[in-house]
Amino acid sequence: MTRRRQIYEGKAKILYEGPEPGTLIQYFKDDATAFNAQKKGTINGKGVLNNRISEHIFTMLGTIGVATHFIRRLNMREQLIRQVEIVPIEVVVRNVAAGSLTKRLGIEEGTQLPRTIIEYYYKDDALGDPMVADEHIACFGWASQEEMHDIADMAIRVNDFMCGLFAGIGIRLVDFKLEFGRFWDNDYSRVILADEISPDGCRLWDMATGEKLDKDRFRQDLGGEVEAYQEIARRLGLMPDGENMILDLESHRKNRGK
């Protein structure tokens, strides 16, 4: 396999230069972090599962007209994506009280919110990704008013679609994180959905039992992280019973010439 130049390495993914201008290869790692990387670990096979799950959701979002950076999955751990300029804002969509919302406002975990809440966080690990308002985003030029309108509109569309998708397989979509990027076409840019959608960035609870099937199992030392991610993939029809999607991280990276 041709050795590709590494562009960037984050907590959960690595970006390599793509085969064509304007493309990148997104590689999913098994590394797990929580609390702004204060807690670190490994979930064996997480990258394989997240690659499949994110591919599935991004592909389905594309069919309803949500523009994304996803082009196609290349192998078990990699997908080809459009190169974008990431907007430095994490968008969190909340349907049910959980996580930091319960701590900030003293709301009991699991409380159904009267309406969906969209929150914005400035992407800066050193600052702990602080929560910001629209006024901060406009003041510091992180995104234009038109871009924020498009981002909010896409976030609601993604939420509506995913709530139905997961409800259909017996899963409650509690909240999730989205990232967006500017896709440039000559001098014109538009905002499209980027990063990934997987159990790493979603809170997913079994509707019948309330069992957590996401990265909270790692955050809260509940154990069974691999089984939870596999259960999401299985219910989405991506992992037939008996199929083993786990792939050793180091051997795969050696094979690709890293």
From Swiss-Prot:
GO molecular function: ATP binding; phosphoribosylaminoimidazolesuccinocarboxamide synthase activity
Pathway field: Purine metabolism; IMP biosynthesis via de novo pathway; 5-amino-1-(5-phospho-D-ribosyl)imidazole-4-carboxamide from 5-amino-1-(5-phospho-D-ribosyl)imidazole-4-carboxylate: step 1/2
Enzyme Commission designation: 6.3.2.6
Keyword Nucleotidyltransferase found: no
CDD domains found in the cross-reference section: SAICAR_synt_PurC
Claim: S-adenosyl-L-methionine is one of the keywords in the record: no
EC supergroup of this enzyme: ligase
Keyword terms: ATP-binding, Ligase, Nucleotide-binding, Purine biosynthesis
Pfam families per record: SAICAR_synt (PF01259)
A cellular component term, taken from the record's GO annotations: cytosol
One of the GO biological process terms: 'de novo' IMP biosynthetic process
Catalyzed chemical reaction(s): 5-amino-1-(5-phospho-D-ribosyl)imidazole-4-carboxylate + L-aspartate + ATP = (2S)-2-[5-amino-1-(5-phospho-beta-D-ribosyl)imidazole-4-carboxamido]succinate + ADP + phosphate + 2 H(+)
Family: Belongs to the SAICAR synthetase family.
PANTHER family in the record: MULTIFUNCTIONAL PROTEIN ADE2 (PTHR43599), SI:DKEY-6E2.2 (PTHR43599:SF3)
Protein name (database record): Phosphoribosylaminoimidazole-succinocarboxamide synthase
Gene field: purC
